[in-house]
Amino acid sequence: MNTDDTKIERQLTVLLRKSVRIHLSTQRGDVSLERSAYGIMCQLADEGPQRLGALAAAFGLDPSTITRQVRDLENAGFASRQTDPSDRRASVLDLTPCGRQVLEQSREHRRFKLQEALSNWSSRDLSDFGRLLQEFNTSMDRLAAFGLLLCTNGFVFG
């Protein structure tokens, strides 16, 4: 690993740690979301209703793990299953109105924290950072597509 790789790895570790702190700060008040619940809820909000197998594949998790996490969302009233219109033998998971509201509150809190952190950045720096972060995520997706990443409990390991 060269010096740049070492710096990047360190900064990613710091970023993960700080993102956990931001996540934990959203757990104040009446509703708290586990990291896994937040991820599943974002996937459903952004991509629409999905079968559990598709959710498991999206996160690189075993279907039994997703099933447990989904059960928690259903028990909390944040998600519900309906019959899949394309195959009546299967079901799809979607957010409930309550789940959408809770997710939006959590996302709003996260956006506020990001705005605070980035308030002194120039427009150009923000644009560059967004572009580079998108490129990084695309590169990580390519690795995952080749099975070079293992996702466990919401964390990615190479």
Give the positions of each predicted feature.
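Charged, amphipathic alpha-helical coiled-coil/dimerization segments
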Residues: 74-131
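N-terminal leader segment of winged-helix/HTH proteins
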Residues: 1-36
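Terminal interaction helix/tail motif
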Residues: 8-11, 15, 108-158
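Short amphipathic alpha-helical/adjacent loop interface patches that line ligand
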Residues: 12, 19, 37, 59, ...
